[in-house]
């Protein structure tokens, strides 16, 4: 009988895929020169927003699914509240994250704005999905 391969030891960096994650701030393929400190700041803040939007969407979808049940069991209320409290804390954090964004002066932003082409934060599909999802929660 052949020896079973030894399991790969999970590491912090491996679990979070840090090599991939931390290379995402370098800009698109062939992007040169490398982003300046101000552009890197801009990229990281916006990527962090998108990561938080991902979690907010998941939490809100879980809460909505539970609330749309024909009968919302009393035992499920703490879980629903947990999802909504987490979303509330994330929104609080996102508001503070704008304070970090405000450390980028308009002049500093204009120094690399042309590199963004016609792109805009309004293109965030997660933000659109969040708007639609929040509107749907009004009618529950």
Predicted regions, residues:
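Short secondary-structure subsegments characteristic of cysteine-rich extracellular domains
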Residues: 62-94
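Acidic, low-complexity proline/glycine-rich segments
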Residues: 1-36, 51
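Short, charged/polar, low-complexity loop and linker segments
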Residues: 24-41, 63-75
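Amphipathic alpha-helix face/heptad-repeat signature
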Residues: 7, 44, 52, 80-90, ...
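Feature marking long nucleic-acid-engaging regions of large polymerase/nuclease enzymes
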Residues: 38-50
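Conserved small/polar residues in nucleotide/adenosyl-binding loops
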Residues: 138-140
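Long amphipathic alpha-helical segments
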Residues: 96-112, 129-136
């Amino acid at each position: 009988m052949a020896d079973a391969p030894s399991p790969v030891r999970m590491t912090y960096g491996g679990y979070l895929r840090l090599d991939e994650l931390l290379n995402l701030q370098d800009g698109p393929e062939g992007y040169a020169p490398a982003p300046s400190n101000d552009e890197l700041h801009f990229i990281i803040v916006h990527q962090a927003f998108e990561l938080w939007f991902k979690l907010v969407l998941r939490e809100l979808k879980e809460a909505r699914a539970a609330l749309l049940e024909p009968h919302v069991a009393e035992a499920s209320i703490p879980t629903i509240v947990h999802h909504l409290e987490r979303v509330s804390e994330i929104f609080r954090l996102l508001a503070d994250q704008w304070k970090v964004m405000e450390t980028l002066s308009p002049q500093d932003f204009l120094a690399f704005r042309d590199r963004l082409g016609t792109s805009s934060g309004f293109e965030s599909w997660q933000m659109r999905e969040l708007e639609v999802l929040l509107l749907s929660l009004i009618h529950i």
